[in-house]
A protein has these predicted regions:
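N-terminal maturation segment of proteins
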Residues: 1-304
Length: 304
């Protein structure tokens, strides 16, 4: 059915309406469909014999051809002709915002709240910066009442200390595993919330889903009993230069990976998803609130 799906996609899509960045992303993701076959299906193909094995081999070969044909269309037709604008415009955005938030808060009100929060958070960042920089050689000025430039310089100097504590290129997933174990143990020790026994596994993000987010949490639905939750981490692309890799690891340093594990897994999305799936109402479990899920995950960052 996948070859037919690809063909229908090509028929339905008007390249001129597709935003360039969307086209480029899907063109990079497409080959990841084959990696799923190579990782999960082909290693187990030996379990089939006779006609069953022949049908599987034929299906895999048909899929390879379909993916290659679709890749050619993506590279030669979609990407070069993608002229769309990802912006949906003020009117549609305001309608979408109200439905998404289930609130009458306007964009201006949200912006005002956000700007006030930026001021508050930067004040906290400066306070912490003074604590970690006081007494250090070459520390910037750290007055009680800094001007904007002094505040910025102090925050940047403190962040450099965090950037320096970063995992190696091939150790991001292992670091995530360690931070997940630490966050889980902390939540239990502090009795913050009931920690579910549902299995959770950290995996490399499937290739066909890379290029959008660094990580995500894939929880089983309320009808999928006993299945694992996957906390997926996108690996650093093989073709990245040392400069690109260092820039990425400076941002996703050890402290940031701690925060990532809290948000995506414990006690963030993984925990919320596990409790949501247990709700007595199947309908409520199926119709989860994305706004609540993200709000909860961000809230737990502060709690932890």
């Amino acid at each position: 059915k996948l070859p037919a799906l690809f063909a229908q996609m090509r028929e339905n899509i008007d390249p001129a309406r597709v935003p360039k960045t969307h086209a480029e992303t899907v063109a990079r993701q497409n080959s990841g469909v084959i990696s799923l076959v190579e990782q999960f299906i082909e290693p187990n193909a030996g379990l089939l014999q006779g006609d069953d094995r022949k049908r599987l081999d034929a299906a895999i070969e048909g899929l390879r051809k379909a993916v290659a044909e679709h890749q050619l269309w993506l590279d030669k037709t979609l990407v070069p002709n993608a002229k769309g604008d990802f912006r949906i415009g003020q009117k549609l955005y305001d309608e979408k915002l109200e439905y998404a938030l289930m609130s009458s808060l306007s964009r201006d009100e949200i912006k005002q709240r956000a700007e006030a929060e930026v001021v508050r958070v930067r004040g906290e960042m400066y306070k912490i910066s003074r604590q970690v920089l006081t007494g250090k050689a070459n520390a910037p000025e750290l007055p009680d009442s800094p001007n904007d430039a002094q505040q910025q310089k102090a925050i940047e100097a403190a962040l450099e200390l965090a950037y320096a504590d970063k995992p190696k290129r091939d150790a991001v997933v292992d670091t995530a595993k360690q931070t997940l174990a630490q966050a889980t143990e902390f939540a239990r020790q502090k009795d913050l919330v009931t920690v579910p026994d549902d299995p959770v596994e950290i995996i490399l993000m499937p290739e066909f889903q890379r290029g959008v987010a660094v990580a995500y949490c894939d929880s089983p639905g309320p009808l999928d009993k006993g299945l694992k939750t996957y906390y997926a981490i996108s690996p650093i692309p093989d073709d990245w230069t040392d400069k690109q890799t260092d820039s990425f690891l400076r941002e996703y340093n050890t402290r940031m990976i701690h925060l990532l594990s809290i948000h995506e897994a414990m006690p963030g999305h993984y925990l919320e998803g596990a409790h949501s799936a247990r709700h007595p109402s199947t309908l409520r479990g199926v119709l989860r609130s994305g706004m609540f899920a993200e709000g909860w995950a961000v809230y737990t960052e502060t709690v932890m």
